[in-house]
């Protein structure tokens, strides 16, 4: 990545210099940049750090995220450095099982496994390399945005090249803040954070094993011990993570030091068997911003919401944000759909992410309980009838979808020849239709622009036929983020569905030209 500023950004142009400016180049920002350039948008990214952030952060993503990475073009690159997680178990201080969250190990409905463990710097490097290879984005490292001035048709962005000590500016049609919990863009939007009342300090430790330690196991374990709640997680290859809750009475001068860490890991591992790679003290928050958009300014990822890590859905939520927002920005900028489409970003995503955060807070209540009476009651209840936990599958909130299946995530079959649906479709709308409606659907796409916008997929293979039957429809429109946009039961509804996808708008623009 070039760590430079093009002097042209200081010139006055009748058109904005960029379609979208992204502030922050972590997983959310890098995923968004990849998806936007797939749709042909001109993107600029500002990142205040000079390299991939090295402190321990996310270690898990799910099959839906892997599907987004597939769209971005990095899924196969990631696979060699992933570990398929079998699930998570919650045990009390006596080691008795309370909650069993076993994940299916095979290929699931999203065309990928349900749970992957990863090393975040590997993911970020893959996203950055793919973006560089594809082109279409200017990436400015060690550049910090400090002012945003929203105009009628663009945003003026002022920033500092911190390596050179130079100030400059550029313009973009929209700005998306993927700049973390202390987001500058969120401050300019002026939104408040709703507090879901879970804030605890934990020390997060990444360890590299010197040799095999099969006894540690492949399951993540939540040790719900009131004396010291602790989490163990296996990573890919020889990586392991422990998360250790800071307790009242801990010596503030020693918390997080190597000596303090090894004392608390002695139950499982010693310095003779592993080395500390990195550690950090975090406060696990649970908050949601009350406004994710103001005009041409938007926020995503930790800038919009923060969750305790007990479901492994913090980074995943940001990836879903990027997936939801990218196609909407592209369609608005290309003129296929109105600007009001961007209002559906928050209305769809906020209830969805709230479900995961509230569930994580509830699980955190089990893990972090320290009151002796409450812990005793918890242990009696949960060991008497072990809970089998299943991952929530919330629908999107109100927005750009309709019908009984609208707002559900669509499946991605893996066919007998090993191919996946999304690879055949590409990053665009997909209309899954029964064989009788396939030709009318194809006939409706009378221009190359329409054909490029919507892929017609006849349901000739059993997985697609079965899914149509399950929805009770003859056609289902999958959005580029693979959520269901709507369904059709006959030719008239099919025509309306295609018009909803912006096909009519695309035709009108072509005729107007």
Kindly give the residue locations of the regions a language model identified.
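Active-site-adjacent segment of FAD-dependent monooxygenases/related oxidoreductases
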Residues: 57, 62-130
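A conserved short coil-to-beta-strand element within the FAD-binding core of flavoproteins
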Residues: 141-155
